[in-house]
Design a protein with these regions (language model features):
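Multi-bladed beta-propeller domains
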Residues: 195-210, 238-256, 282-300, 326-342, ...
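Short beta-strand->alpha-helix linker/helix-N-cap micro-motif
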Residues: 32-98, 109, 113
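Structural motif
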Residues: 119-122, 184-192, 232-236, 276-280, ...
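Residue-level detector of Asp-centered blade-edge/turn motifs that repeat once per structural unit
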Residues: 169-171, 218-219, 262-263, 306-307, ...
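Hydrophobic beta-strand positions that form the internal "hydrophobic ladder"
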Residues: 175, 223, 264-268, 308-312, ...
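Amphipathic beta-strand/beta-sheet edge segments enriched in Tyr/Trp
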Residues: 31, 92-159
């Protein structure tokens, strides 16, 4: 595939595809995670199975297993094998610390879960510093419905990650993506929402034609995306509670690549209503447009700097797709990518330090990371035909679409490149990922 063909896929999809939208409900199909590589330098941590007193009525979720999987996926921590745990304590006074020090782990998680009279669950957890022989975190949750047990496990994972790294965890967050399946020989597309680990997948719309470019609002309550339900590209705004859906851009020509401003007051768009494909900003309260770029080249895939003062976007104004930065106060436009003949799909880390992008090279199209402080540029992946990088809200991971064995899947790579994971569905292909914000 040539560089130009890769670049033109976006425009081609916008121009020629049609879209048919309908609500639907189907059995959920969670993403399956395969961890390709784990760091040998990961810190061991003991995650003790939570105490459960009734062997004949086990809770529907194994909290310790979920928490261990969360921390393992970070690449920073390695849960000790369950078979090697010297005991199953659930209280501080039950811990024989010499046994745990011999295990080589400095920290351990213990806890209990009980079913109450309402049929819900009471949970207690304690995070222990083994060397100091003291509890550093202790918390209880009461009357938790079964459907929220996984969420409690992710909250515990976030607490442990913050305690151990000083960085807020991002396990209790959501991701959006598009799944493509074959139904009666025809392609069917669905926009789905899932937990950050791919579980609890919920489709929010279904189409016989592609769905593109989902973008989360900063409060995590709405998605903007591109649809073709009326035979042309249109940008749709939809609330995740199902109460609101409306078309917000249906101009002549291309309507694509929506991206929310950090304060949620504006949406950056790619429009060709004035001839060429350029970047515009829509005021979400008034609907008024502000044109940011004026160039005959294709200008698209914009994303906001965290301070809201500039936009990063993809343009072939220099003959090949590269990443540029437009400063909204001065109008200055500056090229920022110089390594390689092809760079597209910019995504900015939450702290504004890094720009992830797709770099075209002899090995295909890979996720690359540009450090705006040092200008260090490095390839992050060894996969093929990567697309749509998206940072986790804590900036520690990058979610992206890739191709493996001829099938589109999602993958996650840690910012330090110590671990990668592949997320796939058994009955389809997954693409166009977008990592949502913190929910509280």
């Amino acid at each position: 595939m040539s560089i130009y063909r890769h670049m033109n896929r976006f425009v081609y999809r916008l121009v020629v595809l049609t879209f048919l939208l309908s609500w639907f409900s189907v059995a959920k199909a969670d993403l399956t995670i395969e961890i390709d590589h784990s760091s040998t330098n990961a810190t061991p941590i003991a995650i003790v199975p939570f105490e459960w007193k009734d062997p004949n009525d086990a809770p529907p979720q194994d909290l310790a297993q979920i928490i261990g999987a969360d921390l393992d996926r970070s690449g920073k921590f390695r849960p000790v094998d369950d078979a090697k745990l010297p005991a199953r304590p659930s209280k501080l006074e039950d811990i024989n610390f010499p046994d745990w020090r011999a295990l080589g782990a400095d920290n351990m998680l213990i806890g209990s879960i009980q079913k109450n009279a309402q049929g819900n669950y009471d949970i207690e957890m304690r995070f222990i510093d083994i060397l100091r022989q003291e509890q550093v975190i202790g918390k209880k949750w009461t009357n938790i419905p079964a459907r929220l047990l996984r969420q409690v496990a992710h909250v515990i994972s976030d607490m442990l990650y913050k305690e151990l790294t000083g960085i807020r965890g991002a396990y209790n967050t959501k991701i959006a993506y598009v799944v493509v399946r074959k139904v009666d020989g025809k392609r069917q597309y669905s926009l789905e929402i899932a937990d950050s680990d791919g579980f609890n997948a919920q489709p929010i719309l279904k189409s016989s034609e592609p769905i593109m470019s989902p973008s989360w609002s900063p409060d995590g309550k709405q998605l903007a995306y591109v649809s073709f339900e009326n035979g042309r590209s249109e940008i749709v705004l939809q609330s995740l509670d199902g109460k609101m859906r409306k078309i917000i851009a249906k101009f002549k020509g291309i309507n694509g690549a929506p991206a929310w401003s950090p304060d949620g007051k504006n949406l950056a768009l790619t429009l060709s209503k004035d001839g060429s494909a350029d970047i515009y900003i829509m005021n979400m309260k008034t609907g008024k447009l502000r044109r940011i770029t004026r160039n005959l080249a294709i200008e698209t895939e914009s994303t906001w700097a965290p301070n809201g003062h500039s936009l990063f976007f993809n343009s072939d104004r220099r003959g090949q797709p590269q990443i540029f930065q437009a400063f909204l106060d001065t109008g200055e436009i500056r090229r920022i990518s110089f390594i390689g003949r092809y760079n597209s799909n910019p995504a900015v880390s939450p702290d504004g330090r890094y720009v992830a992008m797709i770099n075209g090279n002899n090995n295909g199209f890979n996720v690359a990371l540009l450090d705006l402080y040092t200008n260090d540029f490095r390839l992050m992946t060894k996969t093929y035909l990567d697309e749509s990088p998206s940072f986790s809200p804590n900036g520690e991971m990058i979610l992206y679409a890739m191709n493996k064995n001829g099938k589109a899947r999602l993958a996650v790579v840690s910012i330090d490149n110590s671990v990668t994971q592949v997320l796939s569905v058994k009955d389809g292909e997954v693409r166009a990922p977008s990592w949502g914000p913190y929910l509280n």
